[in-house]
């Protein structure tokens, strides 16, 4: 079968297009691979630099604490050979008098300033210490709350449930904070707890409520009118004087009890 010129041209263009497209895809993959490799190398270099910086930081801290700026070793004393010569000469000069006077004794160095520590650098050259090199404060800052570990160590066991139940008005506070001094805590412990005593200890809670025990015959009409005139205020405002001077309510099946304030602790908590 003989292909026509048009078919041959079409197949050639089709194959060339896909070949060129494949070459472009391969080139893009190769470029992305090179980019990732370069990025990995750069990250490794940065990691090595960070590790070196972390390794050198303790040395810098030691240098700054010794008095020299970090990163720079204390310079050697200048003209060391020149300084050694007079020292040896001076020692040779003093050999003969020591031999005449008695046994050899350790001779003090005549020039102690030669071996003295280097002077601390000026303030504008010194670098402030790192945050972790600051000395720990002996006393905690009173304006800030303690951390979790200190709070756990300072916390006291909770009080027994029975002791909480005996609290009359929910004023139980047994918290000794570290911010209070020992004197204040001792004074608070010496003071007795306040006693809340309900009134009318000789009577029960039902003594203030005058409920009808048994049905009684209704009062006549004039008595009803007088009783209505006496108690026109359905919700009277009770005071101490009224409580002392007011007579107890009359019992009767026809009248609802008037609410009287109860003193002391109620059952509703």
UniProtKB/Swiss-Prot annotation:
Where is the segment annotated Required for membrane localization? Answer: 2-39
Q: Which residues carry this modification: Phosphoserine?
A: 64
Positions of the region Required for internalization? 146-166
> What are the entry keywords?
Adaptive immunity, Cell membrane, Cell projection, Cytoplasm, Immunity, Lipoprotein, Membrane, Nucleus, Palmitate, Phosphoprotein, Postsynaptic cell membrane, Signal-anchor, Synapse, Transmembrane, Transmembrane helix
Where does the entry say this protein is expressed, by tissue? Expressed in brain. Expressed in the cerebral cortex and especially in hippocampal neural cells (at protein level).
GO CC terms on record? cytosol; dendrite; glutamatergic synapse; neuron projection; nucleoplasm; nucleus; perinuclear region of cytoplasm; plasma membrane
Give the record's membrane topology.
Single-pass type III membrane protein
Instruction: Describe the task this protein carries out.
Output: Acts as a synapse-to-nucleus messenger to promote NMDA receptor-mediated excitotoxicity in neurons in a JUN-dependent manner. Inhibits ubiquitination-mediated degradation and promotes phosphorylation and transcriptional activity of transcription factor JUN. Might play a redundant role in the regulation of T cell receptor signaling. Might promote apoptosis in T cells.
Protein name as annotated: Proline-rich protein 7
Query: What species is given as this protein's source?
Result: Rattus norvegicus (Rat)
Name the gene for this chain.
Prr7
């Amino acid at each position: 079968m003989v292909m026509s010129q048009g078919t041959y041209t079409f197949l050639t263009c089709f194959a060339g297009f896909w070949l060129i497209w494949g070459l472009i895809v391969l080139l893009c993959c190769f470029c992305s691979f090179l980019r990732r490799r370069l990025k990995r190398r750069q990250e490794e270099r940065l990691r090595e630099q960070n590790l070196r910086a972390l390794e050198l930081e303790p040395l810098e801290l030691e240098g700054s604490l010794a008095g020299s700026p970090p990163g720079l070793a204390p310079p050697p004393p200048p003209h060391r050979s020149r300084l050694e010569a007079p020292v040896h000469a001076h020692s040779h000069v003093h050999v003969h008098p020591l031999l005449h006077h008695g046994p050899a004794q350790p001779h003090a160095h005549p020039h102690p300033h030669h071996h003295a520590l280097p002077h601390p650098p000026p303030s504008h050259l010194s670098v402030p210490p790192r945050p972790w090199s600051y000395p720990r404060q002996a006393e905690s800052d009173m304006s800030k709350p303690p951390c979790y570990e200190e709070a756990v160590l300072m916390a006291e066991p909770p009080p027994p449930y029975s002791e909480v139940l005996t609290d009359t008005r929910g004023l139980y506070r047994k918290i000794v904070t570290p911010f209070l001094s020992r004197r204040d805590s001792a004074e608070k412990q010496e003071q007795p707890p306040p006693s809340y005593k309900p009134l009318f200890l000789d009577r029960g809670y039902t003594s203030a409520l005058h409920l009808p025990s048994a049905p009684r015959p209704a009062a006549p009409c004039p008595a009803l009118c007088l009783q209505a005139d006496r108690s026109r205020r359905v919700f009277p405002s009770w005071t101490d004087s009224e409580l002392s001077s007011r007579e107890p309510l009359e019992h009767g099946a026809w009248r609802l009890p008037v609410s009287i304030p109860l003193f002391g602790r109620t059952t509703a908590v």
